[in-house]
Structures are given as structure tokens and as C-alpha cells.
Design a protein with these regions (language model features):
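A short, mixed-charge helix-start or loop-turn motif at secondary-structure junctions
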Residues: 1-6, 26, 30
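Conserved beta-strand-loop-beta-strand hairpin that lines the nucleotide-binding pocket
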Residues: 1-3, 48-76
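STAS-typified acidic loop motif
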Residues: 3-15
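Conserved short strand/loop->alpha-helix "switch" segment adjacent to the catalytic nucleotide/phosphoryl-transfer site
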Residues: 17-42
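Conserved polar catalytic motif of the HATPase_c/GHKL fold
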Residues: 43-47
Length: 76
């Protein structure tokens, strides 16, 4: 499991994408799968920034885990 916590700032959306891409490399995804997962993470992080926290003082947490080959990404 990997836990990441960052400020609710739109610049940190890119960090979430990079960390996710590095984490999922062990699954050997093709480019389409990689793009789909990174897009989903971007949208989830952006939604947290826009709708949950209206200032950069809010914290967003992201947990990435896998069990039996199933990837789980939780963003809150």
C-alpha cells in the first residue's frame, strides 16, 4: 500500500498522476490502460480540489493498493 497526502492545490494533480503511473507499472499496463487510470485519478483529484476544498489549506489523501492483482485507488 502507498499513502500520499498533499495540499488541495491544482498543481498537485500532476503529482498524483505521476505517483499513480509509477505504482501501476508492476501490473505492466498497456498505454490505453495507463492513460485511462491516470485520467480517472486526475478527475478524482480535480473533483476533490474543486468541490471538497475551496482553498489550498485542505488536504487530499490518496491510497493505492493491490491485492490478488486487483488495483484499488482511494482519493478523499
Amino acid at each position: 500500500m502507498l499513502h500520499l497526502e498533499f495540499n488541495s492545490d491544482s498543481e498537485n494533480e500532476g503529482i498524483a498522476r505521476i505517483v499513480t503511473a509509477a505504482y501501476i507499472m508492476k501490473f505492466d499496463p498497456d498505454m490505453e490502460e495507463m492513460d485511462d487510470i491516470k485520467t480517472a485519478v486526475s478527475e478524482a483529484v480535480t473533483n476533490c480540489i474543486v468541490h471538497a476544498y475551496h482553498n489550498p489549506d485542505g488536504k487530499i489523501s490518496m491510497d493505492l493498493s493491490d491485492q490478488n492483482g486487483i488495483l484499488r485507488i482511494e482519493i478523499k
